[in-house]
Amino acid sequence: MAVKENNQGACKRKSAEDLQHFVRNDFKKRSALGDLTNIPCATRCNHYSKCNLSPLKSAKVENPQIYESYDSKINEYLHQLERKRKNSIAVDYMERIQSDVTPAMRGKLVDWLLEVADEYSLQSRTLFLAVNCVDRFLSSSTIKRQKLQLLGITCILISSKYEEITPPSVKELCDITDNSFSKDEVVKMEATVLNALRFEMGNPTAVTFLSSITAVALGDFKEFGLQLETLGCYIAELSLLEYGCLEFLPSLVAASAVFLARFIIRPARCPWNAELEECSGYEPRELKSCVLLLYGCFIRYGRGIIKPSALIPNHYFL
């Protein structure tokens, strides 16, 4: 009996390790982004950042009463904040604002930023905030495609200063672009971006909500805990590549990522339940459009990670 349990445990660990290996296995020396003219959209997301889904997990275990009293208030505040700042990103800025940048170019830039974040071992929240800054800037200011990479590394610099203990230096970020831009250009662009964003850096992103939703999702998924956390993070990061995901609130993207991760791991089990609905604030029917969009991204970019089922049964969204 003990041998059987050990074998089962080893299989689960191996499965989780295989999943983590997949999202890391294309690590290579980073290079400059290159020409964005007529570039196809990124082939796949190959980054796995340090999600750190539950930084207060150990503290909550030791003092559950203290933290539980704040959880609902914090969650309510974050939902209010994301609704308040919803209009800071125009979901159609490519059509209305930009004339020299396309969704495919944005996808190429974000894919490169994923690699930069991997190179410097940046936190997942740093990456998500950087992409948020890119989209907010592009929603209000026109830019030439030749300056798109400059915008990207500038937003990485800004978000790193906001989130990281030791952010990469301006020189390091210039080097990673093969010195396509000078330090003075980056510093000048930093001021331009911050002024365009009105110095508002506290915008919630999908990763902001991923922790609390994943914690609830693990309740009846403990045997697949590591897989669920890893795959949920991966799918959330895939959403960054998809311009179409801008129409959804960050909390809805996070909930959809967890929904999809649970379905991919256990397709025969309904991926949503009353606890997840209460925690996220979303019924499954509200997640359908985003889940299907993310599932398409996963099929395109995540080949080999886990063999997905052909279709998500419609009754899972009822």
Predicted stretch roles:
Residues 1-153, 157-318:
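Acidic, serine/threonine-rich low-complexity regulatory regions at protein termini
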